[in-house]
């Protein structure tokens, strides 16, 4: 439902007949008329017969507005009739459109008027002869037509439910119902009643009994609508009493629209609307579309069967402002107007026209907002499909003597142009625009100043003529529009939620204000809707391509935790290069043997630093090392997100991976190219790991290695050709068997009982007798991955022999078989789209377990056969499905680029987990094995060998490092060593200063910018950060800081994890002395050195031009990684950004961040290191360029000061922090200049 916009804003001016009528309405500051608070609009409705809009107000007036289409693109509403329904100034409660007129409901009266304002009938308590009727007809609340009747009106009162026949208005019937009826609506054969307590009751007027009652809302029901067999309700809930028991109840709008099905008498899935629902309406022509609004102007069109199909608009509620009290008003009127000035405009009275082309609402100040669809180019002028003509008043001529001016008399008198008669005596229709006669006095219409129409562009004429010359059968619907030549089109702003399907809660942490309870409700709403889809073509939300959003606070403000439903498994960010590898890395991360071998390779040291290596590998690392670091960070991160930047950078500089680089998140690839890319990376990764193990540690990495044998034999008696070759590969390419072999192979791989086999053989014989081809549907239940695996591992084909063909024709047999299976079986499913359709048609292609049985032929091994169940005898291996990488096609046409992404399913501790970049959620097993969707294609499948107890090797995580840590105690420079360079650090000594758990070290890092940030600038100048700037580590300094001890008198500030553990023990004479000060070598282009903040000068990081001793990135990273795994505690200022850019996942218990300690949440401002040093330490730092050693030492001293203040008393630091912020307010948080 795109293309809606506001087409008219009508101020409903009050015109009470009193002495103050001239001052009963005012103009607001923006020109919109605002209603006198004495009389405001209470109800609105579209007419069901004519193009009219009806309004009722608090003074008992009913007025109508007629639509006039002023142009193809605009519409106006003009007053048509206005009449008063009573003399007691009772407010109009409700209006209904009737075929004979309009019905209006007051507190004790029901009346009907025709559309010209002439009364037809009125029913009140005095209309009934019986005293019972007089007692019933009071305190009226709501009304509706009875089921399938336009003459019978059902009215809800304070205590009863009654029925009035307008043809027999002196009789009233009481239904068998007690209790207050707040709203009543007609449904097919039933009445829907809303009570004051929030319940929904279905009442049968024929049997005069209640059918069903639903508990819809906790408080009261604010709106209700019915379409077909569905009822939609919205309401409010009672807030808990916060102060005392007798407190008046407070209500809050419910964030859900409840939907009830009349046929099943059950509630169906509600519609989420976090802004709070105030009104709800079904679309009259599209019963699946629901229009939901909030009191603050948010409008949403949502499909109740597919709630991801949403269109969102926002009404401009700022157009109405309450008027100032008019001069001469009474004190009561002025008091009411002053109360209204304090109120905010709110959306109410939502109504939609019968044809569904318009809807309207009131803003609380009697301004009527009319909306319509404008994306078709023109507006509809009708509110109903076939409107009746509106009766217009007759035009009466003025007095003949006046109009005639002496030239005529009577009707049709003519006014001469020279007659001395003012034209104002004729009268004018109602108008709001400036008249043509309103021109300046000095304006003269002369030929020289006349403006001629713009000529038609010749390009458009030539296009039209060319189309005519081509003899097009019909006139084209449009001609190409050149926006560069003619400017932007007048197109309304477009709102869509397609790219952001997870909108149940705010994206940014700074936007949250609902607390933990609201967050839990939002997460539950997301979990309920994540797999909701009505057909196979609609892809659930969890498979969507995710996009990280950036606020003004950066990526730290993005709520990654919302997308992770676990406590121990991390997600991977997708805004780095080559992010398509995330799904495969998650899969290998949870294969324990693979993980253990890779991660524990870090126990040994491999740090190449020669110039030849740095020219091609500036990071001085390898795929093995970076994958090991990444796996360890993924474990330590728990449920926090992790970046793959370091791994991707090493991959980018590897020449063997040149064809695997992807920098735009697969947007330039189609479905088949995406699958080929991830399979190629899988082969590269396994091959590269094997090479790295062999080159670095002389170790054979055969975890996934399959041994194969190729045998070539001549079939002729005299053909001597025979050859046998052996080989190995790290993954197996699955091949689809030919159709004529599928039937036979499905029986061999998936044997049933002997009786079933005989039945299948009989069926095959019958098919062969009838000479019909093999029907794949008959064997579909037996086909699965084992069929493909059996065929792929045991290849057999024949080719003509070319060497001995002249003797007699014969062929050569070529047999390929797998002779050895690895512990981890990696299968590449590189099939075509047509072959995937076969998999989609199978009942269950993947199997959770498989058994590999050694096949024998005359005593010799002939490969393997695969069974879905345990063999009775023989040598076999059991494999269990670990998971698979899956390609998701978001486009029906898979040949189109973009719209494809990769996800993975992994079995962890007997539970299936789903990984989609940083989205991590548990997933049902049925969804994992369901491959019947055309958009879901398995690409890489991994099975792992298990023992008889279905166990695999346990994970061996690195919690306390015990390997080679010698890099901490020596220098390891890259390239030439500058002897003249003066070192500013002193290396650690292993005997006295070996890092231990609890050792304090101060750290600070400086970065340079490799790539600038990417911004999206809208037409109005607003900027949106699409991708942040790419930073790289340039310098890191680490200082000695003593040890941390336990002190029960110390309490942390704003960091509960640090309570009672903040004591410092300083026994090192080199306290505050640096032991690491590394400058990182860079070979790639540096966009910005940011010298003012980093202190890095140009050429400082160039291996040939730098005056400093440089190290590779892996050398610096390994030092920090060793400190982390040795259990040291890092002290610094703003460590979140440093560790995130370095890609180091440090547990919170190992971080002491002074930016968090010296932070007071009530001020919502973090203090800079420079300002804290000035106030707390009485020192001036960062006087020139930043120096990482100085910054780290300052943070260490600030932490020492924090500990000292907490040791004195619990309130000492709190007092000092208040003083710091007071100084900040006085100095504007800046250090005064000298």
UniProtKB/Swiss-Prot annotation:
Catalytic activity from the UniProt record: Exonucleolytic cleavage of poly(A) to 5'-AMP
GO cellular component: P-body; PAN complex
Compositional bias (Low complexity): 14-30, 333-344, 754-772
GO molecular function: metal ion binding; nucleic acid binding; poly(A)-specific ribonuclease activity
EC number from the UniProt entry: 3.1.13.4
PANTHER family: DEADENYLATION COMPLEX CATALYTIC SUBUNIT PAN2, PAN2-PAN3 DEADENYLATION COMPLEX CATALYTIC SUBUNIT PAN2
Subunit note: Forms a heterotrimer with an asymmetric homodimer of the regulatory subunit PAN3 to form the poly(A)-nuclease (PAN) deadenylation complex.
Protein's recorded name: PAN2-PAN3 deadenylation complex catalytic subunit PAN2
Provenance organism: Lodderomyces elongisporus (strain ATCC 11503 / CBS 2605 / JCM 1781 / NBRC 1676 / NRRL YB-4239) (Yeast)
């Amino acid at each position: 439902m795109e293309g809606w916009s506001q087409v008219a804003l009508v101020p409903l001016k009050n015109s009470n007949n009193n002495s103050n009528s001239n001052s009963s309405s005012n103009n607001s500051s923006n020109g919109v008329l605002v209603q006198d608070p004495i009389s405001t609009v209470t109800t609105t409705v579209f007419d069901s017969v004519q193009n009219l809009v009806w309004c009722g107000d608090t003074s008992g007036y009913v007025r109508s507005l007629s639509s006039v289409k002023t142009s193809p693109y605009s519409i106006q509403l003009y007053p048509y009739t206005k009449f008063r329904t009573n003399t007691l100034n009772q407010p109009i409660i409700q209006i209904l459109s009737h075929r004979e007129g309009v019905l209006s409901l007051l507190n004790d009266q029901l009346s009907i008027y025709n559309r010209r304002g002439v009364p037809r009938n009125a029913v009140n308590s005095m209309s009934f002869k019986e005293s019972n009727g007089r007692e019933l007809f009071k305190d009226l609340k709501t009304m509706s037509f009875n089921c399938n009747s336009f003459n019978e009106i059902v009215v809800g009162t304070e205590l009863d439910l009654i029925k009035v026949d307008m043809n027999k208005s002196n009789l009233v019937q009481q239904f068998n119902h007690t209790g207050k009826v707040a709203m009543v609506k007609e449904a097919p054969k039933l009445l829907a009643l809303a009570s004051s307590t929030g319940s929904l009751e279905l009442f049968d007027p024929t049997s005069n009994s209640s059918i069903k009652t639903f508990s819809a809302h906790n408080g009261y029901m604010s709106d209700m609508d019915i379409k077909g067999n569905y009822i939609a309700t919205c309401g409010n809930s009672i807030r808990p009493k916060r102060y005392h028991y007798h407190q008046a109840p407070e209500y809050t709008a419910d964030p859900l629209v409840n939907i009830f099905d009349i046929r099943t008498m059950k509630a169906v899935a509600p519609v989420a609307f976090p802004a709070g629902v105030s009104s709800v309406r079904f679309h009259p022509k599209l019963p699946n579309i629901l229009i939901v609004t909030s009191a603050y102007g948010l409008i949403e069109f949502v499909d109740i069967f597919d709630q991801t199909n949403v269109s969102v608009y926002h009404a401009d509620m700022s157009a109405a402002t309450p008027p100032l009290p008019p001069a001469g008003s009474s004190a009561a009127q002025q008091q009411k107007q002053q109360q209204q000035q304090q109120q905010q405009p709110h959306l109410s009275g939502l109504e939609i026209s019968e044809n569904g082309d318009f809807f309207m609402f009131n803003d609380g100040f009697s301004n009527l907002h009319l909306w319509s669809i404008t994306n078709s180019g023109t507006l509809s002028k009708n509110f109903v499909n076939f409107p009746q003509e509106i009766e217009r008043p007759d035009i009466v001529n003025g007095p003949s003597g006046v109009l005639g001016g002496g030239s005529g008399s009577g009707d049709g008198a003519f006014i001469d142009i020279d007659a001395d008669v003012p034209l104002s005596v004729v009268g004018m229709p109602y108008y709001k625009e400036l008249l043509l006669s309103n021109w300046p006095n000095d304006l003269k219409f002369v030929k020289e100043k006349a403006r001629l129409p713009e000529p038609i562009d010749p390009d458009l004429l030539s296009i039209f003529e060319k189309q005519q010359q081509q003899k097009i059968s019909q006139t084209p619907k449009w001609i190409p529009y050149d926006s560069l030549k003619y400017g932007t089109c007048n197109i309304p702003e477009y709102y869509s939620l397609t790219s952001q399907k997870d909108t149940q809660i705010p994206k940014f942490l700074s936007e949250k204000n609902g607390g933990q309870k609201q967050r839990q409700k939002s997460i539950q709403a997301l979990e309920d809707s994540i797999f909701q889809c009505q057909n196979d073509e609609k892809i659930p939300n969890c498979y969507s391509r995710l996009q990280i959003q950036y606020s003004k606070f950066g990526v730290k403000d993005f709520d990654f935790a919302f997308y992770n439903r676990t406590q121990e498994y991390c997600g991977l960010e997708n805004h780095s290069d080559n992010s398509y590898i995330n799904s495969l890395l998650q899969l290998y991360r949870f294969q324990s043997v693979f993980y253990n071998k890779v991660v524990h390779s870090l126990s040994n040291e491999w740090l190449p630093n020669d110039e030849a290596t740095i020219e091609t590998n500036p990071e001085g690392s390898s795929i093995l090392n970076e994958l090991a670091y990444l796996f360890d960070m993924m474990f330590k991160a728990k449920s926090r997100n992790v970046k793959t930047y370091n791994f991707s950078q090493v991959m980018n500089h590897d020449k063997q991976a040149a064809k695997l680089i992807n920098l735009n998140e697969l947007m330039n690839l189609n479905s088949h190219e995406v699958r080929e890319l991830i399979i190629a990376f899988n082969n590269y990764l396994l091959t590269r790991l094997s090479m790295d193990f062999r080159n670095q540690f002389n170790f054979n990495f055969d975890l996934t290695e399959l041994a194969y044998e190729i045998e070539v034999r001549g079939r002729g008696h005299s053909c001597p050709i025979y050859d046998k070759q052996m080989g190995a590969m790290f993954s197996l390419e699955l091949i689809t068997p030919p159709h004529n072999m599928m039937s036979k192979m499905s029986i061999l791989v998936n044997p049933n009982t002997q009786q079933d086999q005989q039945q299948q053989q009989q069926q095959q014989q019958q098919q062969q007798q009838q000479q019909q081809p093999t029907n794949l549907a008959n064997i579909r239940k037996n086909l699965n991955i084992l069929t493909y695996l059996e065929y792929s591992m045991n290849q057999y084909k024949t080719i003509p022999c070319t060497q001995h063909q002249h003797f007699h024709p014969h062929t050569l047999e070529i047999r390929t078989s797998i002779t050895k299976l690895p512990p981890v079986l990696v299968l590449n499913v590189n099939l075509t789209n047509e072959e995937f359709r076969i998999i989609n048609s199978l009942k269950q292609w993947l199997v959770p377990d498989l058994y590999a049985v050694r096949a024998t032929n005359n005593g010799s091994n002939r490969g393997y056969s695969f069974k879905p169940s345990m063999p009775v005898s023989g040598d076999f291996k059991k494999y269990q499905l670990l998971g698979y990488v899956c390609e998701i096609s978001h486009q029906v046409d898979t040949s189109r680029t973009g719209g494809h992404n990769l996800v993975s399913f992994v079995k962890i501790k007997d539970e299936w987990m789903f990984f989609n970049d940083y989205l991590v959620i548990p997933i049902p097993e049925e969804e994992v094995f369901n491959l019947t969707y055309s958009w879901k294609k398995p690409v890489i499948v991994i099975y792992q060998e298990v023992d008889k107890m279905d166990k695999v090797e346990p994970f061996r995580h690195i919690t306390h490092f015990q390997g080679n840590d010698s890099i901490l105690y020596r220098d390891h420079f890259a390239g030439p060593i500058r002897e003249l360079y003066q070192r500013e650090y002193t290396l650690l000594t292993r005997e006295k200063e070996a890092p231990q758990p609890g050792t304090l070290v101060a750290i600070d890092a400086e970065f340079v910018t490799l790539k600038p940030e990417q911004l999206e600038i809208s037409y109005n100048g607003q900027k949106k950060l699409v991708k942040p700037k790419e930073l790289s580590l340039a310098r890191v300094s680490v200082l000695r800081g003593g040890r941390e001890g336990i002190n029960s008198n110390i309490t942390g500030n704003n960091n509960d994890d640090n309570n009672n553990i903040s004591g410092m023990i300083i026994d090192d004479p080199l306290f505050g002395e640096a032991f690491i000060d590394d400058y990182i070598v860079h070979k790639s282009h540096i966009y910005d050195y940011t010298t003012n903040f980093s202190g890095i000068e140009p050429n400082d990081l160039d291996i040939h031009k730098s005056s400093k001793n440089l190290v590779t990135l892996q050398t610096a990273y390994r030092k920090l990684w060793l400190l982390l795994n040795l259990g040291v505690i890092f002290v610094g200022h703003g460590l979140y950004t440093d560790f995130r850019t370095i890609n180091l996942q440090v547990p919170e218990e190992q971080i002491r961040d002074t930016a968090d300690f010296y932070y007071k949440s009530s001020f919502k401002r973090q203090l800079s290191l420079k300002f804290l040093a000035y106030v707390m330490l009485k020192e001036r730092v960062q006087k020139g360029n930043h120096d990482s050693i100085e910054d780290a030492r300052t943070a260490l001293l600030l932490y020492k000061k924090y500990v000292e203040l907490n040791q004195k008393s619990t309130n000492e630091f709190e007092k000092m922090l208040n003083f710091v912020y007071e100084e900040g307010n006085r100095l504007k948080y800046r250090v005064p200049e000298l």
